[in-house]
C-alpha cells in the first residue's frame, strides 16, 4: 500500500489560516511489511525520528485513540518526500494527512473525508494546509467551535513559481512576530480584502486576486523582516508581469502567480538575483490524498 499526499501553499496573502492550494510536490508513505517494532526508513535527516516519535506515527496513534481502535501489528514503513522541510510548503500537514490515512487503512476505519479533515484540524490547529493536502486544488476553510466548513474549487489557470530559501523558518517562530490583536478598523479592512480575494479566486479573476494577495493586513507586514526575499521578488513580479507574490504559509518560501507566457522571463530575472535558495516551477495538484493498493 502506498499513500501519496501533496505539498501545500497556504494563506495566499489575505487568506490567513484559511485559504490554501495543493501543489505538485509529494510525500509518499509505503507499507513494506509487518515488523516487531514500528520502523520508518527515510533520508530526511537525523532530526526526523524513525520510530514512534515520528509525526506520522504520533498522528496514527491520535487517530486510533480518537476512534477507540487499535492495531494488532506494527509495520516497517518507507517515507520519501519532495517537500522541503520547514519552508512554508506544508511539510508537517502532508505527514499528518498521511498518518490519518495510514490509521484509516490499517485499522479499517472507513473514515469519511469530513472525518479526516476534522481529525487533521484537531491535530494541526487550522485548516489552511491540511484541507488542500487532503482535497487537492484550492480550498477555503474555517474551523470554529471544533467544526470545519470548507469550499473546494479549481484554481484559476496560471503558473506557480516558488522560491525556497536555503534557511528554515519554523511556524512557531514566524508566529511570534504577529500581534496579539488588530485594531477594529484594521480588522475590518483585512476582512474585506480577504473577502474580495476569495471572490476573485472563485471567479477566476487573477488580476484582482493578485492585488488582494499583496494587500494583506493579517501577517505579511509583520513577517517581512524574517524573509527579505519577499520584497525583492515582489518588486521583480511587479516589473515583469506576475499577478501577485506572497509568503507561502509561515515562510520562508515566496510564491509568485504568473501568466503562462511570463514563466521563462521571471525565472530568468529571479535567477539573475543570485539569491540563496532553489526555484521551483509548480502546478496546482487536483488530486489531494491518493492511496495506491488500498486495503479498504
UniProtKB/Swiss-Prot annotation:
Which InterPro entries does this entry report, sorted A to Z? GHMP_kinase_C_dom, GHMP_kinase_C_sf, GHMP_kinase_N_dom, GHMP_knse_ATP-bd_CS, Homoserine_kinase, Ribosomal_Su5_D2-typ_SF, Ribsml_uS5_D2-typ_fold_subgr
One cellular component term (GO) for this entry is: cytoplasm
Q: What is its main location?
A: cytoplasm
Q: Specify which residues bind ATP according to the UniProt entry for this protein.
A: 84-94
The pathway this protein participates in, as annotated, is: Amino-acid biosynthesis; L-threonine biosynthesis; L-threonine from L-aspartate: step 4/5
Name the chemical reaction catalysed here. Answer: L-homoserine + ATP = O-phospho-L-homoserine + ADP + H(+)
EC number(s) on file = 2.7.1.39
Ordered alphabetically, the record's keywords are: Amino-acid biosynthesis, ATP-binding, Cytoplasm, Kinase, Nucleotide-binding, Threonine biosynthesis, Transferase
- Localization (cell): Cytoplasm
An example Gene Ontology molecular-function term: ATP binding
Picking any one GO biological process from the record gives: threonine biosynthetic process
The UniProt entry, under NCBIfam families, shows: thrB
Return the PANTHER family for the record: HOMOSERINE KINASE, HOMOSERINE/4-DIPHOSPHOCYTIDYL-2-C-METHYL-D-ERYTHRITOL KINASE
Q: Which family does it belong to?
A: Belongs to the GHMP kinase family. Homoserine kinase subfamily.
Q: What does this protein do?
A: Catalyzes the ATP-dependent phosphorylation of L-homoserine to L-homoserine phosphate.
Q: What is this protein called?
A: Homoserine kinase
What species is given as this protein's source? Lactococcus lactis subsp. lactis (strain IL1403) (Streptococcus lactis)
**Gene this chain is encoded by:** thrB
Amino acid at each position: 500500500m502506498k499513500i501519496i499526499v501533496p505539498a501545500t501553499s497556504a494563506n495566499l496573502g489575505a487568506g490567513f489560516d484559511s485559504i490554501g492550494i495543493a501543489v505538485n510536490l509529494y510525500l509518499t508513505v509505503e507499507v513494506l511489511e509487518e515488523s516487531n517494532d514500528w520502523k520508518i526508513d527515510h533520508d530526511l535527516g537525523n532530526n526526523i525520528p524513525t520510530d514512534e516519535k515520528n509525526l506520522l506515527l504520533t498522528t496514527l496513534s491520535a487517530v486510533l485513540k480518537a476512534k477507540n481502535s487499535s492495531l494488532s501489528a506494527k509495520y516497517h514503513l518507507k517515507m520519501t518526500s519532495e517537500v522541503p522541510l520547514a519552508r512554508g510548503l506544508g511539510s508537517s500537514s502532508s505527514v499528518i494527512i498521511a498518518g490519518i490515512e495510514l490509521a484509516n487503512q490499517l485499522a479499517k476505519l472507513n473514515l469519511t473525508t469530513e472525518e479526516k479533515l476534522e481529525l487533521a484540524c484537531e491535530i494541526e490547529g487550522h485548516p489552511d494546509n491540511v484541507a488542500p493536502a487532503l482535497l487537492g486544488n484550492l480550498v477555503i476553510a474555517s474551523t470554529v467551535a471544533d467544526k470545519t466548513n470548507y469550499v473546494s474549487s479549481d484554481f484559476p489557470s496560471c503558473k506557480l513559481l516558488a522560491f525556497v530559501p536555503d534557511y528554515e523558518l519554523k511556524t512557531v517562530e514566524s508566529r511570534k512576530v504577529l500581534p496579539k490583536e488588530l485594531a477594529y478598523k484594521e480588522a475590518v479592512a483585512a476582512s474585506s480584502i480577504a473577502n474580495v480575494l476569495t471572490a476573485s479566486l472563485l471567479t477566476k479573476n487573477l488580476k484582482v486576486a493578485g492585488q488582494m494577495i499583496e494587500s494583506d493586513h493579517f501577517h505579511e507586514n509583520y513577517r517581512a523582516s524574517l524573509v527579505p526575499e519577499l520584497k525583492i521578488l515582489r518588486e521583480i513580479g511587479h516589473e515583469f508581469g506576475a499577478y501577485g507574490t506572497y509568503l507561502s504559509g509561515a515562510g520562508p518560501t515566496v510564491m509568485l502567480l504568473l501568466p503562462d507566457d511570463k514563466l521563462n522571463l521571471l525565472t530568468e530575472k529571479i535567477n539573475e538575483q543570485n539569491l540563496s535558495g532553489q526555484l521551483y516551477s509548480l502546478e496546482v495538484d487536483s488530486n489531494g490524498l491518493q492511496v495506491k493498493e488500498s486495503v479498504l
